[in-house]
A protein has these predicted regions:
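Short amphipathic alpha-helical interface segments
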Residues: 1-45, 99-150
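Tandem-repeat/low-complexity and Cys-motif detector
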Residues: 11-12, 150-151, 161, 179-181
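Short amphipathic alpha-helical interaction segments
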Residues: 41-63, 151-168
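Polar/charged low-complexity regions in secreted precursors and cytosolic/nuclear IDRs
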Residues: 58, 65, 87-88, 169, ...
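Short, Lys/Arg-rich nucleic-acid/phosphate-binding segment
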Residues: 64-74, 174-184
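Short, amphipathic alpha-helical interaction segments positioned at domain boundaries
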Residues: 74-115, 185-202
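Amphipathic alpha-helical binding modules
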Residues: 164, 183-186
Length: 202
C-alpha cells in the first residue's frame, strides 16, 4: 500500500476501496480532471463504487451540472463521455498525502490560501477548525462564518471570504431545500467532508 492509499484508508476507514480510489485521485490530481474511460482503465470492476465514494466524500465531482455549479446539482453518471474533477483543495490534499502518507486538511487550506494571496492565510487552519466545530451534519450558515471571522480577526469581508472558500472547494451552497435555508435565516453551505476527520454533529 502506497502513501496516498494509507492516508485515504485512515480517512475512509475502508482500505479495500481506498486502493482504486487513490489511483484515480493520483491520476486526476495532475490536471484536476479525469474521464470516465480513464477511471474505467484504472479501476476495472470497482468503477461505480469508486465514483460513488469519491462523490460522497466530495473528493471527485461530476463536471455535469443540472441547475447551478453547487455540489448537490452535479449529475453523477457512470457512462462513457462523462468526466469528473477534483475540488481545488483536494488536489493539495492528494499531492501532499502522496509524499507524506498523511491526510492534512490544515496544511492544505493554508497552502491554497497562500497561493490565492490571502494576507491572513496563516489563520485559515484556525477557521477550518472553527467550521468543523460549529457545523451540523457538515452544514454551516453565512452568519456563523461571519461570527468566526470576528473571533479570529480575519480582515476580509465575509462575502469575499465565502466566495474564496467556494472557489477553493472547502464548501458549496446548499440550495436544494428552501425550508432548511428559511430555518437557518441565512445562506446555507455544505462543507467538504473530506476536510474533517471527526464525525459531524447531527
Amino acid at each position: 500500500m502506497d502513501k496516498l492509499e494509507k492516508a485515504l484508508s485512515a480517512l475512509l476507514e475502508d482500505a479495500e476501496v481506498a486502493v482504486p480510489l487513490a489511483a484515480v485521485l493520483a491520476y486526476a490530481s495532475k490536471t484536476g480532471r479525469i474521464s470516465y474511460n480513464e477511471v474505467t482503465e484504472i479501476t476495472g470492476d470497482n468503477l461505480e463504487e469508486v465514483l460513488l465514494l469519491g462523490n460522497k466524500w466530495r473528493l471527485l465531482l461530476p463536471t455535469k451540472v443540472e441547475k447551478s455549479g453547487a455540489w448537490e446539482d452535479r449529475l453523477l453518471l457512470c457512462k462513457p463521455g462523462e468526466s469528473y474533477e477534483l475540488p481545488n483543495i483536494v488536489r493539495y490534499l492528494v499531492q501532499n498525502a502522496s509524499k507524506t502518507e498523511h491526510w492534512a486538511p490544515m496544511r492544505a487550506i493554508a497552502e491554497i490560501f497562500k497561493e490565492m494571496d490571502e494576507p491572513d492565510w496563516q489563520k485559515m487552519p484556525e477557521l477550518l477548525a472553527e467550521l468543523g466545530e460549529s457545523a451540523r451534519n457538515y452544514q454551516i450558515t453565512a452568519t456563523q462564518i461571519g461570527q468566526m471571522c470576528s473571533r479570529i480577526s480575519l480582515r476580509k469581508k465575509v462575502d469575499v471570504l465565502i466566495a474564496e472558500l467556494k472557489a477553493a472547494g472547502v464548501m458549496s451552497p446548499k440550495l436544494g431545500s428552501l425550508a432548511e435555508v428559511s430555518r437557518a435565516g441565512s445562506p446555507l453551505y455544505q462543507l467538504n467532508p473530506s476536510l474533517f476527520t471527526k464525525k459531524p454533529r447531527k
